Regions:
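Conserved P-loop NTPase motor cores
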Residues: 11-133, 159
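Conserved P-loop NTPase motor module
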Residues: 1-9, 16, 20-21, 27-35, ...
């Protein structure tokens, strides 16, 4: 595995194996990063909440938290994402999710429902105006949080970039079939 980029895709995995598969993939990624002594490494983990959420195993959650801290301690980058903040704070009073957030210097908060924005308000020191703003963001807008500095940002893409990264079901269907619904 000497490639610059290694992707472990679990998208076709049966639902009852997702947690085990995610743990396996995360463990492999961690081992690879630990063996890259002279190079900066980055772990980009989408939906890692499955290992720290309500139905997760505390040992797996502890492994994820320790992994994020270790990667950061080595000067690497650990990027995690979730569409539901509640998931991160469901296991054992949210200690694992809070630990992951605390280990992350930079946080990007995209649009979310008020209940979820309130859940992270104290953890990220968000003002009432920032909570309100988060609930009103449109696609491509977010709040960049670095320590106590919070800056609203907007991402703009070229058509080529949008086509490469879109997750819009409508746009993906058009891309796949070449047809626009009437």
């Amino acid at each position: 595995l000497n490639n610059k980029y290694i992707v472990l895709d679990l998208s076709g995995m049966p639902d009852d194996m997702i947690a085990d598969g995610t743990f396996w993939a995360t463990s492999i990624a961690y081992d690879l990063i630990m063996n890259c002594e002279d190079e900066l490494s980055a772990l980009l983990a989408d939906e890692l909440w499955s290992l720290v959420g309500a139905t997760a195993n505390p040992q797996a959650a502890g492994f994820v938290l320790e992994m994020v801290k270790t990667i950061r301690g080595l000067g690497g980058i650990a990027v995690t994402s979730t569409q539901g903040m509640q998931d991160l704070f469901s296991l054992e009073g949210g200690s694992y999710g809070k630990g992951i957030l605390d280990s992350s210097r930079i946080k990007l908060v995209m649009q979310m429902e008020e209940q979820e924005a309130r859940l992270i308000q104290d953890k990220l020191n968000l003002s009432e105006d920032e909570v309100r703003q988060i609930t009103r963001f449109r696609r491509g807008e977010g709040l960049l949080c670095i320590g106590y500095n919070h800056v609203p940002i907007a991402f703009h893409t070229t058509p080529k970039e949008y086509e490469a990264i879109t997750t819009s079901p409508t746009d993906l269907r058009i891309k796949r079939t070449g047809q626009i619904d009437e």
